[in-house]
């Protein structure tokens, strides 16, 4: 079983990852065993709702000592490099939810550290797997096959005043 750390649990992205991982538990593939957040109340609330068997770590270093992989879902991209660092230094794989970092310098440093430690680091968005997106994709495929759709654009609401980077 892969023991996973979840770092930064304020967003719904963390909840979705927790639900996905829990759905694999019957097969004993992976489990969230540790949580860390900048706000201990966020961590406690998250554990109660999504990961009741997980322990809340006092530090990222402590958490890195008891897991096999990490998922970083903190809302602030400017924190991602420092949050991923302890896990990468241990040579373990890390998934960083978008954005990878908030600056090109941090992104380069994160990739360099992963190379030096022979660790896997990856980042991306799970939006393409969201139910609404998948449903829209199926509708578009049918319309393309019926020669009713030749191109399109997908627009979404974005908060230009969001405090998150």
How should these model regions be labeled?
Residues 1-51, 144:
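N-terminal Rossmann-like dinucleotide-binding module
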Residues 6, 72, 95-97, 121-124:
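Short catalytic-loop micro-motif centered on adjacent basic/acidic residues
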Residues 13-15, 80, 93, 125:
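Histidine-centered active-site/metal-ligand motif
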Residues 19-23, 85, 89, 112, ...:
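Short, well-ordered alpha-helices that flank and scaffold nucleotide-derived cofactor binding pockets
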Residues 30-32, 67, 149:
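Core-facing hydrophobic residues within beta-strands of well-ordered domains
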Residues 35, 70, 152:
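Receiver (REC) domain switch-region micro-motif
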Residues 50-111:
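Beta-loop-alpha module in the N-terminal Rossmann-like domain of NAD(P)-dependent dehydrogenases
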Residues 101-163:
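A contiguous active-site-proximal alpha/beta segment in oxidoreductase catalytic domains
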